[in-house]
Amino acid sequence: MAPEEVTITVRLIRSFEHRNFKPVVYHGVNLDQTVKEFIIFLKQDVPLRTSLPPPFRNYKYDTLKIIHQAHKSKTNELVLSLEDDDRLLLKEDSTLKAAGIASETEIAFFCEEDYKNYKANPISSW
């Protein structure tokens, strides 16, 4: 059986406080790969994308979280929902499919330390 390949949007979050993010669309993503393999791919791909400003290409991303799944409701958060971490944060040892990723899913790629700091004090600078 051929691996299932889908299109997903990865939102690169540079700053939670300043709501600084850039979406990048990936086509042909294999859902049978692990989250860890996908993170490694993203860490190799993002610095090579000349369409992204250098601050986004050179940032220390390390965590993935589901923002939105196709045909489901969206949150009111402008950057990323601070709720349901146990369900929406992707665990590195699971496959993308087992983690709930499907076609047209939007996921966030960010620095976990920045996320924890923002979650403890969710104040935007503008």
From Swiss-Prot:
InterPro entries: UPF0538 (IPR018794). It comes from the Eukaryota. Pfam families: DUF2340 (PF10209). Belongs to the UPF0538 family. This is UPF0538 protein C2orf76 homolog. The lineage of its organism: Eukaryota, Metazoa, Chordata, Craniata, Vertebrata.
